[in-house]
């Protein structure tokens, strides 16, 4: 005999919400789906160029581990001072 009540509840009119407004309805196991990007505001579909992440992975790594451009410029100056003292 098969088990009853093992499947999640199905919502045939689930709302997809992007930036606080309902952009479409679809079927889902959740009543509301919150998304950051959808086809209506994605640069590929709209034909516009938009920078979503202003700080790249390398910049975040440099900032996190203290290897930013300010630190590297200071270390170069210190190295030049040491070389001039020799």
UniProtKB/Swiss-Prot annotation:
Gene3D superfamilies tied to this protein: Ribosomal protein L31 (4.10.830.30)
SUPFAM superfamilies: L28p-like
PROSITE patterns: RIBOSOMAL_L31 (PS01143)
GO biological process per UniProt: translation
Segments for region (Disordered): 66-86
Biased composition (Basic and acidic residues): 76-86
Record keywords, A-Z: Ribonucleoprotein, Ribosomal protein, RNA-binding, rRNA-binding
Electron transport recorded as keyword: no
Signal peptide interval: none
Assigned GO CC terms: ribonucleoprotein complex; ribosome
UniProt keyword Signal present: no
GO molecular function: rRNA binding; structural constituent of ribosome
Domain of life: Bacteria
Annotated family: Belongs to the bacterial ribosomal protein bL31 family. Type A subfamily.
PANTHER family hit by this protein: 50S RIBOSOMAL PROTEIN L31, CHLOROPLASTIC, LARGE RIBOSOMAL SUBUNIT PROTEIN BL31C
Function: Binds the 23S rRNA.
Subunit structure: Part of the 50S ribosomal subunit.
Protein name per Swiss-Prot or TrEMBL: Large ribosomal subunit protein bL31
Organism: Prochlorococcus marinus (strain MIT 9215)
């Amino acid at each position: 005999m098969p088990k009853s009540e093992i499947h999640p509840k199905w919502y045939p009119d689930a709302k997809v919400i992007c930036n606080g407004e309902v952009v479409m309805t679809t079927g889902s196991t959740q009543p509301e789906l919150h998304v950051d990007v959808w086809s209506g505001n994605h640069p590929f579909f709209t034909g516009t160029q938009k920078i979503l992440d202003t700080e790249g992975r390398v910049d975040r790594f440099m900032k996190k581990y203290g290897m930013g451009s300010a630190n590297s410029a200071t270390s170069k100056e210190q190295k030049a001072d040491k070389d001039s003292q020799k």
